[in-house]
């Protein structure tokens, strides 16, 4: 039986690049991602640097099949995120290889967060007006999601600026 370990580590939605970097650092140390849950990561022992890990938000089943054709293995998902791993010996493994694909990825995150933020804002205001005690919780969630949206918008603006420099 392979040696396993589970690690609890919290990443915010705008930290997906840091999460991916950490997962690849773990693979470099000989621990490859085998399963994931909300902030829980299960790793199995591997050869250091044997795998490259990538994550993507809410890809279609066609996209998942395409990634599989590239030689990657679907590890699993958590909420709207899916995780892939591929043997490093197969060469470079980039899912978001250009500015346009990165902007599209950030736009998907933006749409999801916007809908959840709007729902929490509406529920928070409605519950506050009806003197429900949970209204403040929805408003707090809306505020946190607004912060996340600001971070995502900042990332998109930086990419747009980078694209304009290359044109």
Spans of model-derived segments:
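Terminus-proximal functional modules
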Residues: 1-167
